[in-house]
Design a protein with these regions (language model features):
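Conserved SAM-binding loop of SAM-dependent methyltransferases across substrates and taxa
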Residues: 49-79
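Conserved SAM-binding strand-loop segment of SAM-dependent methyltransferases
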Residues: 104-124, 128-131
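A short acidic, Gly/Pro-enriched loop at the edge of an enzyme's catalytic core
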Residues: 124-146
């Protein structure tokens, strides 16, 4: 019998980088804080593994898989929850669809996978001129929440392209919808570096875990003129015989590091009623009760900071 090959890089990425169960709680709380009700429809742009979409639907089930909070704790939307996962790569979406079917069973139909440019996918009532490709955009629902996580907003390099995306996202939202993205910055974001972290996967969602592995995040180069960052992800996976299988350049990114003022200003210019920066902060004197998620007016000069940016329609 042939030896099994190394795990799919998408699987390793899912375990090393993403925390979808936490993300769907965060997205729900943001919406509830801003709109005083629970969201039902999530759209995940640049979806990749579509982990947030799967977790969104899983959390709505009373028998949610282990690792996902049941909707009763976070949501009154319950069985009304559905998700739309948009990505341009067919192989990645096929992997994500198989994972959704495995984890969600008959509820997998509540996640719709759409292959295409995020700028070509819109509700029918939001469609203006034909997309340059000539293809009619698929009919999709307006979203309560559009998520652009894993720093995917940095794929846009030019101001006019980012502005066009924000305008499009606003049109794709329901009347009280919000756009949520995350960003990072600080001196550490511009420094050449390699960060290593050991990952010991423990199944929490009913899916088999890959072998233990090392996750390596490399910031290979930074261009101060264009504010562009060359990033790579590598993996070194444990083998049964004690060796390792190395997957170099499993993922590569050419990102423009947008600043928080640029992002909030462009959101407002795109027609959003408000644009806010949110962070997790912690008051050590309050212990577990000291964790706070909410808007901030200032971020101190940290070596590397992380933040959410919310466009409020």
């Amino acid at each position: 019998m042939a030896a099994a090959g190394p795990p799919d890089p998408l699987e390793l990425y899912r375990w090393a980088v993403q925390d979808p169960a936490t993300h769907v709680v965060v997205l729900s709380r943001m919406y509830a804080r801003l709109r005083n009700r629970q969201p039902a429809v999530l759209r995940e742009d640049f979806a990749g593994t579509s982990a947030e979409s799967v977790a969104w639907v899983a959390a709505a089930a009373p028998d949610a898989p282990r690792g996902y909070p049941a909707a009763a704790h976070e949501s009154s939307a319950g069985d009304d929850r559905s998700a739309l996962a948009v990505d341009h790569d067919p192989a990645t979406l096929a992997w994500a669809r198989r994972r959704a079917e495995r984890l969600l069973g008959e509820r997998a139909g509540r996640v719709r996978f759409v292959e295409g440019d995020v700028l070509s996918v819109a509700p029918l009532d939001a469609c203006g001129a034909a997309h340059p490709s000539g293809a009619a955009p698929p009919e999709v629902p307006a979203a309560d929440v559009i998520s652009v996580l894993n720093f995917s907003i940095f794929h846009f390099h030019r101001r006019e392209n980012l502005a066009a995306y924000f305008q499009h996202a606003r049109r794709c939202l329901a009347a009280e919808g919000i756009l949520v993205l995350n960003a990072f910055g600080g001196p550490g974001a511009m420094r050449t570096r390699i960060d290593r972290r050991r990952v010991e996967p423990v199944p929490t969602t009913g899916e088999p875990a890959p072998p233990p592995f090392e996750y390596r995040w490399e910031q290979r180069g930074y261009d101060a003129v264009a504010n562009r960052l060359d990033c790579r992800i590598h993996f070194a996976v444990d083998e049964a015989d004690g060796g390792t299988t190395t997957i170099e350049n499993a993922f590569q990114y050419d990102w423009r590091i947008w600043t928080l003022p640029e992002l909030t200003e462009l959101m407002r210019e795109a027609g959003f009623a408000d644009a806010q920066v949110w962070r997790h902060t912690w008051d050590a004197s309050k212990g577990k009760e000291g964790v706070f998620l909410g808007p901030v007016a200032r971020i101190e000069n940290l070596d590397t900071w992380l933040a959410y940016v919310i466009g409020v329609r």
